[in-house]
Amino acid sequence: MIKFLFIFLSIITVSIKTNANTFFGVDKNDYSSVERAFKTETPPLFQYKGNKFCKGGTLYMTPYDKFNKSKKSHTSGKLKSWFFALSFGHAISSYLEGEYHSDLVHLKEDFINEYIPYLVKAAENKYFTVNKWTKGGSSVAYSQYMILINLSVFMDFMDNKNLWKTGQREKIVKWGDILYERSHYNHYANGGRKQHHRWPDTVSKAAAAYMLWGFVNKDLKKFKDGYRDLMQEYKKIPADGKYHQHFKGPYAGEIMDSWDLYLENKTLGDLVIASYVGELVGMKTFRKLNKKGGSIIKAIDYLGQISSNPNELKGQDERHLNNMRADGNSWMTVYRKLDKTDNNPLVNLHLKTSEEKGYGFSQILNFSRCIDNELK
């Protein structure tokens, strides 16, 4: 009987390992540089110094609940969780505005005395952790990635400003870990969906979210999870940079034909963010060539070419060219930290258009030019 039980457990163990490797593939990436970095004090993600872009931030403390509900379609408007995700960037900007202007010091006090308790309460009440999908509707997991991206930056800000009170950080990490787990398509909370059901824009958003969450908490498991997602898309980039997934690719027209280039822009932007986090801990992808001869910077170079070509722009919404309208351009701040040449026409365009609001309208990394005024 004991021998039989041993054999049975061995089979189960092998099966689990096989399934894990089938799902992820055998992870042959060398994470030694990440392990070393996580054993020491990691650098801050951004500068977090008050500047002219730190204006207009508001302490949004809207009460929500644990339900993360979908809309009927991808074009039905923003989810409540999206508005919640915006609150982190607003709060950081408000604090830094108070730091930048001595006559607005009350903004810092309100941040500490009002917003932080609100956020801790949100963590205790597990905001947006119970997923409610609508058939054919927008992805609720995607909104959890958005929360994790902005929450990660917020936590990095708090860490580097030494603003935590006893027990606050632990409560928020516990909540964030639930968001992380339930954002996986194959989690039981997501109605039988599978990881391979994700579109490239979803994979790239997960890559940025998981790598950031792993970075700020020095959690190697979660960082690896995100890095595998980054690799999934990074490996697709050819030597000429023509990523072509949502634009002229297999996912073209899945939502609206006119959104193809806009979605390609958001997808590649999230890959830039993920690549940046990797670069901070020695995992190179921004300029490093993959087996096809492609890299992140090559994909962005090509994106810049087509985004400034009138023939390629025909029939496209062009919202990714308009900082005041789009929700996916704040990654330009991160890009300029990695490449300061300004040779890319799309990057150069956003350097000019962001002078007014500093990406205050973006869904992720909103107020990015406030949290890191990347130009020296």
Show where each model-derived region lies.
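Sec/Tat signal peptide C-region and signal peptidase I cleavage site
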Residues: 16-20
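Sec-dependent N-terminal signal peptides
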Residues: 4-13
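Aromatic-lined, polymer-binding surfaces characteristic
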Residues: 76-283, 293
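Short secondary-structure subsegments characteristic of cysteine-rich extracellular domains
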Residues: 287-303
